[in-house]
Amino acid sequence: FHTEFRKILGELENGEKTIYTSNVIINTILNSKFHVAERKKIKVSTSILVPKEMNLDYSDAGILLGNLLDNATEACEKLPAGKRWMSLNMLYKEHMLILKVSNSKDGKKVDINKSRKRNLVSSGIGTHSVKCIAEKYNGTVSFMDMGETFEVCAVLYGIF
């Protein structure tokens, strides 16, 4: 993950930066992922209220946000450009980090345990990693397929 993080930082130094939050780690991850989404004509909306510093490990933040936003981008790409959207809501409250990622998708039922990626070695690792991060922070994660919308909600506890 360290190599990936340095690559992201390098890309952002050469490109446009948006300030989503004063938390440098989260802001760096979001800039990287949202620039990719915007290049793919995906409308992005955010509502983020997190402190400048918190004890969420940067590699955990990268795995959690990276996998969820990559999955949302991948689902949106299967739709015509005008129907592509994703939203991220993050709220820090009373030592909890509450996160919701929603995105448009085709109407096909999603099986989160089954990857559509061609690389079978990494199949299902993304959602498994998200579950592991939630468990590490004594939290929960839920995946909801609502037809043309997919939503992931995660709550992490003990975040200071």
Which residues does each predicted region cover?
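Conserved short strand/loop->alpha-helix "switch" segment adjacent to the catalytic nucleotide/phosphoryl-transfer site
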Residues: 18, 44-64
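Short beta-strand/loop element within the Bergerat-fold HATPase_c
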Residues: 83-95
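A short, flexible helix-to-loop-to-beta junction within the catalytic ATP-binding CA
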Residues: 37, 73-81
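Short beta-to-alpha transition helix within the HATPase_c
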Residues: 6-10, 22-39
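Glycine-rich ATP-binding loops of the HATPase_c
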Residues: 138-151
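Short alpha-helical Gxxx[C/S/T] motif in the catalytic ATP-binding
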Residues: 126-130
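Glycine-rich/acidic phosphate-handling loop/turn and adjacent ATP-lid/helix
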Residues: 95-125
